[in-house]
Amino acid sequence: MILIDLGSIRNPAANCGVYGFKPTAFRIPTDGWCSIAAGADAIPAVIGPLSTSLEGIKLFMSTVIDSKPWLSEPALIPMPWNYQACSPHQPLKIGVMWHDEVVTPHPPITRALCEVVTKLDAMPNIEIVDWKPHLHSEAWAILSSLYFTDGGEETKALLAESGEPWMPLTSFIVKDNPCVKKLTPKKMYYWQEEREAYRKEHAKIWNDTATGAGGEGMVDIILCPVGPGVAPKHNTAKYWSYTSQWNLLDYPAVAFPVSKVDKEKDNVNEEFSAMTDVDEENHNLCRLFLLEYHAVD
């Protein structure tokens, strides 16, 4: 299955216990597809695969990119698909982001992350370090200001034309979002400058993880939750920053299955202390999500 990602590849993958890959922008051809506000690329949507296997992800990407789509879509990056495994001569350095300092993941997510880290840490060719998140609340302010630069007018017009009602989460991200405003050119330039400044700050943080000259010993991968919980009850998925963060930065990202909810292990923390108001809201949803058949990515 092929989806368009502003979180809409990785979240369905995580909710269903399958693999989902968000490439960087301008990797996969977009001829023949359509979206709301087509041509608005302040935060470009990208196309990527869902699959029941990692091999399916690799097959999709290699097949599409081996066809050299940049010959017909010049905006695409003319770069082959490269698959490079780690080895004793080229160890992998993984930075683990346990939470984003805004919202604490629910117990199944943290447990699954612990299990993955434990297995990776036992491998001789992998180094594990902690990754400190960089101002994710600020990142969300930038991102959500650039999602609907027309103030949501096209979305509102399409819904009015269709006669369909506003769904709760659509209202949440468009109508109720204080950052959604019709931007003047001057404001548009401001937020795009903020986007680029944030990207540079993040790049410096990443580059500073190097332990040797020329970037040697730098973190290769950030391992983190896909979201703050497992598949949510309808109309409750209001915290998007675990996925949208990587859209703002335009980093590739993959969701992969790890486990399922285990009620013997995944107990609600009764002594929980919230970092933020939205963290408290997310914690209060925890009991709704802890169903044993739920996948954990």
Name what the model sees in each region.
Residues 1-64, 252-257:
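Short glycine/serine-rich loop segments
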Residues 63-244, 248, 258-294:
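Amidase signature
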Residues 13-16, 23, 39-45, 89, ...:
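Short, solvent-exposed loop/turn segments at the edges of secondary structure
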